[in-house]
Amino acid sequence: APVDEKNPQAVALGYVSDAAKADKAKYKQFVAGSHCGNCALFQGKATDAVGGCPLFAGKQVANKGWCSAWAKKA
């Protein structure tokens, strides 16, 4: 199941299913071009539309999504 943006955990992390809608004023660490699909936490392939994330157990995040825990994939 996809992560609901209104889920308390999602709200706390500023999760959005479309990185273009990330609150860049609130999250100064936002990096242009960052999204779930190129995050170290993303548990899918770079080509998958959705994938697992350890921050949202049992849920799937959008590849093009974003949250404040984003960390560049090595």
Swiss-Prot record:
Entry annotated with the keyword Secreted: no
Gene Ontology molecular functions: 4 iron, 4 sulfur cluster binding; electron transfer activity; metal ion binding
Under the heading InterPro entries, the entry gives: High_potential_FeS_prot, HIPIP_sf
Asked if the record carries the keyword Iron-sulfur, the reply is yes
Role, per record:
Specific class of high-redox-potential 4Fe-4S ferredoxins. Functions in anaerobic electron transport in most purple and in some other photosynthetic bacteria and in at least one genus (Paracoccus) of halophilic, denitrifying bacteria.
What family does this chain come from, according to its entry? Answer: Belongs to the high-potential iron-sulfur protein (HiPIP) family.
The subunit field of the Swiss-Prot or TrEMBL record says: Homodimer.
Q: What is this protein called?
A: High-potential iron-sulfur protein
Q: Which organism is it from?
A: Rubrivivax gelatinosus
